[in-house]
């Protein structure tokens, strides 16, 4: 089987304190277990936690998975989100893609600073990326976290020539992970998620509470469990045929902030 080579730009936080989500980690585990995918590296960004914590989380997650062969690079932080400032992550991203032009798919699961920085310093990079899959954005007015964390970076990426697939927040609302799914995982002790079930259960309870409050303002958000946002974008890499009604749109950012 020819594996699809990918780079993952990510802000994982399941294994560290002071994190706001665990969906990046679940998406990475999903892709690690997928024979169709070859992960060439992880570039870490801020978002669900600080850059120091997301970097530590990524290293620990790959150690748990026995995949220390996959390199991990530290990128921008909340206080260093400047596309004019190169980082280890932005350099690795650009160098890896440019060594294999037209081959390496990029998956972004957090704010887009690292990719925007790579594009700023390597103008030929956009032509070398065959596909960019992003978890981010929304179709109705209002900010989505990944794009809203650094609007200028998001706008730079959106206006680039890279072929893009945007997995929006509304799309992810169609796939809640419920207590019933967790019970099925508990019945499979061989599952690679087994060791993480306690933290997943805690997050399910917390996110159900959070969304019960948000639903007062946005009643269209379905009830159920929690939403594994980034796992939906990862699923697109495995099998795009799972997705219907794909729309071709021109997308950009308005009211761009810092």
Task: List each model region and its residues.
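N-terminal acidic, glycine/proline-rich low-complexity segments
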Residues: 1-258
